[in-house]
């Protein structure tokens, strides 16, 4: 692991950023980070978010289930400790989306207080497909409007050098990183989710009887550690990277059967990168976030 055309917009991306440590004193190092609380920032952006399910079968084939999401067009603003971004998929950016499939909702909050990294996920996808590139016996995508995925998660980390390294500067430009800085961090994460269809999920024409399933539930929790850093160059350009690895105690159940469940330890990782240019009047950047969640292996299920 991981619409019927209507006139009301579908909100698929929402971020609310605030500093929850109101009662604590945390001073930034002004030699490294410039705080700009008086500025009101307005942004226009493109985004693409999705949660895939990747199933590896006993004979070595790989099937990738992809949701009926798409390319989003959005607007947002930042003022002091509040950031709000709203976006939706628009038709001219998504000519291949299934227009009559159910609505979906993908809520992600990426919070960067001055010495913390917090990620919250609430994903509710309806309708998945397997592209033809992942099918051995078909030249057309395999469409399943009935497949539903639900995923909830929390990732929390403490940034040791938060007074010199601001991830807010890379993410929403409410701060400006003036000099390069780096920091290790430690924390924990917890995730739970399910995927279910009205019948077996893999197509019958693929002949994967032993590795086929109609539902899956999973849960995992464990500690993680990582490293973050920003390199500043060229009078305002920056390159930020954040990577963490995790070992989680995990549980997976297939086909709602107590005979097909398993506890185990699984490795996961979280990768994000930011590149752009920041100033008090203008900012442009590109962001990439990838969260990998593994399931416990069980016989023919991987």
Model regions: which residues?
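Residues that define the transmembrane beta-barrel architecture of outer-membrane proteins
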Residues: 38-40, 67-73, 78, 101-105, ...
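Outer-envelope beta-barrel architecture signal
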Residues: 36-42, 71, 80-82, 114-118, ...
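Surface-exposed strand-loop-strand hairpins of Gram-negative outer-membrane beta-barrel proteins
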Residues: 49-72, 83-99
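Residues on the lipid-exposed face of transmembrane beta-strands in outer-membrane beta-barrel proteins
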Residues: 44, 73-79, 107-113, 154-160, ...
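Extracellular loop and loop/strand-boundary signature of outer-membrane beta-barrel proteins
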Residues: 58-63, 91-95, 104, 137-145, ...
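Predominantly the C-terminal beta-signal and adjacent terminal strand-loop region
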Residues: 269-302
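Transmembrane beta-barrel strands of outer-membrane/channel proteins
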Residues: 42-50, 77, 86-90, 111, ...
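Outer-membrane pore/translocation modules
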Residues: 29, 108-216
């Amino acid at each position: 692991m991981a619409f019927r055309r209507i006139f009301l917009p579908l909100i698929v991306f929402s971020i609310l950023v605030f500093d929850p440590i109101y009662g604590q004193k945390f001073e930034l190092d002004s030699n490294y980070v410039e705080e700009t609380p008086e500025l009101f920032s307005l942004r226009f952006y493109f985004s693409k978010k999705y949660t895939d399910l990747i199933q590896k079968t006993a004979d070595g084939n790989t099937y990738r289930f992809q949701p009926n999401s798409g390319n989003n067009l959005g607007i947002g603003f930042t003022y002091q400790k509040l950031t709000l971004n709203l976006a939706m998929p628009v038709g001219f950016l998504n000519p291949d989306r299934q227009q009559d499939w159910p609505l979906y909702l993908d809520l992600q909050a990426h919070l960067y207080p001055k010495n913390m990294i917090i990620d919250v996920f609430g994903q509710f996808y309806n309708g998945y497909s397997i592209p033809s590139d992942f099918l051995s016996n078909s030249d057309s995508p395999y469409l399943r409007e009935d497949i539903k995925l639900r995923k909830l998660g929390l990732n929390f980390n403490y940034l040791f050098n938060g007074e010199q390294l601001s991830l807010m500067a890379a993410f929403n430009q409410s701060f400006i990183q003036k000099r390069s800085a780096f920091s290790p961090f430690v924390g924990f994460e917890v995730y739970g989710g399910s995927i279910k269809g009205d019948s077996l999920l893999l197509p019958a024409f693929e002949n994967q009887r032993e590795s086929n399933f109609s539902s899956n539930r999973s849960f995992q929790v464990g500690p993680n550690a990582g490293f973050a850093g920003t390199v500043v160059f060229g009078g305002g350009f920056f390159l930020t990277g954040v990577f963490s690895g995790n070992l989680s105690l995990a549980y997976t159940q297939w086909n709602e059967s107590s005979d097909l469940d398993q506890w185990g330890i699984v490795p996961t990782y979280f990768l994000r990168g930011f590149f752009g240019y920041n100033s008090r009047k203008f900012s442009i950047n590109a962001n990439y976030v990838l969260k990998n969640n593994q399931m416990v292996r069980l016989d023919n299920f991987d």
